[in-house]
């Protein structure tokens, strides 16, 4: 028997493959069809594989993609380039040593190791602003305001920069000089709400109010003593 030359294998049911670039030029499909995931490259490779026994279909292949190239090399430049995502390596939680981790302190974070333990911020809270402290150079007393420190230091130096222009009496504070001037003007702007008596200085009114408080407390104590005595007398007669 003589050897017979077998023809090239032809697929029984080749899928009909179309060149979408050619169809786009003929206005058969919208422009955005061949932009989806590189369909032109995909169908070109399939056309080169399945048109072995169909020479009439080879004209539909897209000339931009050579048939010798495999699919990944032909369609790689059509697919969008994705940059590798750098993920932060998170430490895995050790459930086996949960009790040990709960009793130990957290390792110091960079930037917080310089802080002292009392000034280190708590979890979930911002570090509180430290109050300004003004220290007296004579006795070491602390103040939160510079004006209060200035007035306090004048008690050590006996500095009295505010002088009355009538009697030339000097004062450490400006409000003390203002109250002193009411004495010369015979004006008494500070009135007591209980007895209506007027005073030239607010400090004198404050001392006067303490007298009212002492008097009211003494009268209340005396009234309580009288009630107690009356109750005791009634109990004895019964």
Curated annotation (Swiss-Prot):
Start and end residues of each stretch annotated as Disordered: 105-126
Deletion: any effect?
A: Embryos show a down-regulation of early pronephric markers lhx1a/lim1 and pax2a/pax2.1, and subsequent defects in renal structures. In addition, embryos at 72 hpf display pericardial edemas and kidney cysts characteristic of kidney failure.
Q: Which Pfam families match?
A: zf-C2H2
Does the record's keyword annotation contain Nucleus? yes
Query: In which compartments does the protein localize?
Result: Nucleus
- Which tissues does the record link to its expression? At the 8-somite stage, expressed in the pronephros, with weak generalized expression elsewhere. At 24 hpf, expressed in the kidney tubules and the anterior duct, and also in the gut. At 60 hpf, expressed in the tubules and the pectoral fin buds.
Q: Which GO terms describe its molecular function?
A: DNA-binding transcription factor activity, RNA polymerase II-specific; RNA polymerase II transcription regulatory region sequence-specific DNA binding; zinc ion binding
Q: What does this protein do?
A: Transcriptional repressor. Required for pronephric kidney development.
Q: Which family does it belong to?
A: Belongs to the Odd C2H2-type zinc-finger protein family.
Name-wise, this protein is Protein odd-skipped-related 2
